Curated annotation (Swiss-Prot):
Substrate binds at S214, I235, A236, G237, S238. The active site is at K138 (charge relay system), S214 (charge relay system), S238 (acyl-ester intermediate). SUPFAM superfamilies: Amidase signature (AS) enzymes. Fusarium verticillioides possesses 2 unlinked loci, FDB1 and FDB2, necessary for detoxification of antimicrobial compounds produced by maize, including 2-benzoxazolinone (BOA). The FDB2 cluster arose as a duplication of the FDB1 cluster with rearrangement and expansion by incorporating additional genes. Its EC number is 3.5.1.4. It comes from Gibberella moniliformis (strain M3125 / FGSC 7600) (Maize ear and stalk rot fungus). This is Amidase FVEG_08295.
Length: 530
């Protein structure tokens, strides 16, 4: 068998992707020459400098939420076609500034949008609650006829998907318009944005900063308004950290509230350890609720045997919440931008009449060690196997989440550990149950990350997100404030490099209380905007 020239396949893949951007949407070299992972430039400023978007396109892509945009389309004030065109064009521009797309199918999107307009005109009603809404998808989510390489070199020889993922079918049935898929890091198990096929995705706020991971491309597109709603996934923080790094909202639901089936393979079938879940990313808290309500009301358990048959129930709005506040783990203290903006948010919530309860939490390292013991049980390790199959080099960022770094020397993973790990998870959950009961809280407010976006390659372990994956607690991210080189200047901390980067916090609810967690997210977001 002839030796495969992987670099040639990589070059072909990238060239094919770039050729799908219409010539009139291409940025001039005077702009693209400034786009490097070392640049301190803002993609917002570069987009404005390019001047390719019309006032109407800017209006469509920036003015609306998903809730208000679908309402405008439903009444005919905006056409699905015009909306799709505006978002396709902006996504293409955002990609050229951040390297955030893997698959581009704008032609399919415009064809779909035209059909939706004809349906609305003929039938006098929408297809569903997401009629005409452009939605971006993380690369692992199958779209029939499109590739799902996930940045694995060995996957470049795989054929395109022959069917949709269940989530793709359900969103399409609700009226969504798909137009592109987004970049991920190698293995999808690091909070970074680099793989050997597509390269590195950049943060739109400052190109030298990371957009987080593994839903890297989703975050970059949403942050710069190339997307209004996206679908990511989360097994250790992969929705939430990118959300906080790019100033958008993200939600990690209880596992199996959303369908997982028929996606690109990343783990052994039937894996019952710490499990991944899909999760929406958007620009408002209300849009997160729109996504979750739309899918769950459509009864995903009818299409996916792993989805839980738990109907959607609207959580009554509580204008005065009891909020537990966990400011940090002393072993992993948060950096000044997070400490400052979290304190500001808590102060404003208290002033608005919400009850604040200060929480002392179990060490995050306890959760990390338990989770890593789970991950170590997977002796196959499909993502790493995919790297080896492609004879590609593992990226340096994988070291941050290497299970061996958190396990005792000489630790041997075997299936007998399953019972011990399950018992430890039970005990850890009981610790949190006691805290929840004694404080009587509706939701927990805590960090999502030690800091705001970091320079590429400098993110450490996911200490503030992985506890909730281990316990399977629904959790959201609320963007609030920005890093400030003057206000955040502290001894030993370089506040200049992250100046202007978004900050925010995480909200955590009890298991299966997704609706209540989303309600609290809306209330808290509304309070902070007032």
């Amino acid at each position: 068998m002839a030796e495969v020239n992987w670099q040639q396949l990589i070059n072909q893949k990238r060239a094919t992707r770039e050729a799908l951007i219409p010539e009139q949407w291409l940025l001039p070299a005077t702009i693209t020459s400034k786009v490097t992972p070392q640049s301190t430039a803002s993609a917002f400023e570069l987009l404005s400098e390019a001047g390719l978007l019309t006032e109407r396109e800017i209006d469509i892509t920036e003015k609306y939420t998903a809730v208000s945009l679908t309402a405008k389309i439903a009444t005919g004030e905006l056409s699905s076609y015009d909306v799709a065109t505006a978002f396709c064009k902006r996504a293409a521009i955002v990609h050229q500034l951040t390297n955030s797309l893997t698959e581009i199918f704008f032609d399919k999107a415009l064809e779909r949008a035209r059909w939706l307009d004809e349906y609305l005109s003929k039938e006098g009603k929408t297809v569903g609650p997401l009629h005409g809404l452009p939605i971006t998808l993380k690369d692992m989510i199958h779209v029939k006829g499109q590739y799902s390489t996930m940045g694995f070199v060995g996957h470049l020889r795989h054929p395109p998907a022959d069917e949709n993922a269940v989530i793709t079918d359900m969103l399409e049935a609700a009226g969504a318009v798909f137009y592109c898929k987004t970049n991920v890091p190698q293995t999808l198990f690091v909070c970074e944005s680099f793989n050997n096929v597509f390269g590195r995705t950049l943060n739109p706020y400052k190109l030298c900063l990371s957009p987080g991971g593994s839903s890297s491309g989703e975050a970059a597109q949403l942050g710069l308004c190339g997307s209004i709603m996206g679908v990511g996934s989360d097994i250790a923080g992969s929705v939430r950290v990118p959300a906080i790094f790019t100033g958008v909202y993200g939600f990690r639901p209880t596992v199996n509230r959303l369908p997982w089936s028929k996606q690109a393979e990343l783990a052994l079938k039937g894996w019952q350890g710490v499990q991944p879940t899909l999760g929406p990313m958007a620009r408002t808290a209300q849009d997160l609720t729109l996504f979750m309500k739309t899918i769950i009301q459509a009864e995903p358990w009818r299409y996916d045997s792993t989805a839980l048959a738990i109907p959607w129930h609207d959580a009554p709005r509580k204008d005065k919440l009891t909020i537990g506040v966990w400011s940090q783990d002393p072993q992993f203290p948060v950096f000044p931008p997070i400490a400052r903006t979290m304190a500001s948010a808590v102060g404003r919530l208290r002033a608005a009449g919400h009850t604040i309860k200060i929480i002392e939490a179990p060490p995050t390292m306890k959760a990390m060690k338990i989770a890593m013991r789970w991950f170590a049980l997977d002796q196959v390790n499909l993502p790493l196997k995919f790297v080896q199959d492609g004879a590609e080099s593992p990226i340096a960022d994988l070291d941050a989440m290497d299970p061996g770094k958190f396990l005792d020397p000489g630790y041997v993973a075997d299936l007998s550990e399953n019972i011990s790990i399950s018992a430890d998870i039970h005990d850890y959950r009981e610790e949190w149950a006691k805290i929840w009961r004694e404080a009587g809280i509706d939701v927990l407010l805590c960090p999502a990350s030690r800091g705001s976006a970091v320079p590429h390659g400098e993110f450490g372990p996911l200490m503030y997100t992985i506890p909730w994956n281990l316990l399977d607690f629904p959790s959201s991210v609320v963007p609030f404030g920005k890093a400030d080189k003057t206000l955040d200047s502290k001894d030993g901390y370089d506040s200049t490099v992250v100046d202007g980067a978004p900050t925010g916090f995480q909200l955590v609810g009890w298991r299966f209380q997704d609706e209540q967690t989303l309600m609290a997210t809306e209330v808290i977001a509304d309070t902070l905007k007032a």
